[in-house]
Swiss-Prot record:
Protein family per UniProt: Belongs to the PetM family.
One GO CC term, this protein: plasma membrane-derived thylakoid membrane
Lineage per the UniProt record: Bacteria, Bacillati, Cyanobacteriota, Cyanophyceae, Nostocales
Protein role: Component of the cytochrome b6-f complex, which mediates electron transfer between photosystem II (PSII) and photosystem I (PSI), cyclic electron flow around PSI, and state transitions.
GO molecular function, one term: electron transfer activity
InterPro entries registered for this protein in UniProt: PetM_cyt_b6/f_cplx_su7
Main location class: membrane
Subunit comment: The 4 large subunits of the cytochrome b6-f complex are cytochrome b6, subunit IV (17 kDa polypeptide, PetD), cytochrome f and the Rieske protein, while the 4 small subunits are PetG, PetL, PetM and PetN. The complex functions as a dimer.
Gene name of this polypeptide: petM
Protein name, as recorded: Cytochrome b6-f complex subunit 7
Length: 34
């Protein structure tokens, strides 16, 4: 088992999760402003 492979998988998953969280937060903020 390669540590680099695990790091790459965690990094890509983390970026996807952060992007989803930011998108959901922006939608919630825009919905509250309207």
């Amino acid at each position: 088992m390669s540590g680099e492979l695990l790091n790459a998988a965690l990094l890509s998953f983390g970026l996807i999760f952060v992007g989803w969280a930011l998108g959901a937060l922006l939608l919630k903020i825009q919905g509250a402003e309207e």
